[in-house]
């Protein structure tokens, strides 16, 4: 009950912001660009080891990411280019955050970790492949958004990792980003494999339906003349 009340309160705040931005004739594309700019700042903060502030900036950046689409729908300014811009800059936003983490763990400091650099790089490639698999699959099938580690889940994991990581602390609960990178590295490839399998299954199902339809049409076209011939033979005068 308490959680639902918080959710409703947050939604009312977001709805008010959307209405205000729509009435102010703020372009949804401007909101998209502001969001990606904040994500670039987040990547820089990660690179310098300012994890807590990177988490705060990431929250604000993804608030803009939520607002742009809603403002576009409310103001009637939904465009194909806007959708393309939003999707493209989302990929850039993901990558700059991963790169910031790779820079932090690759620097010649006491926090240097080759393993964490590898995990961040693997998670970066996996997240790109998840997005690419979805985009490519949807040119072949109606929808491909399966998998448990999509972009919203990655953002939440980044925020959890950022706000619960304090470089220099030996406490496991104050250094969660490495664990987050493990989850994202493994989860991204699992989601990629799931989307590959889903696309294969849907294409096979479509092929079976097409073959069944062709076979049905072929049978119907062949049975028609036979029935007409039988009717002619039956009614032919002796």
Locations of the language-model features?
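Hydrophobic alpha-helical transmembrane segments
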Residues: 1-55, 62, 96-238
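Hydrophobic, well-structured mid-protein blocks that either form specific transmembrane helices
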Residues: 63-113
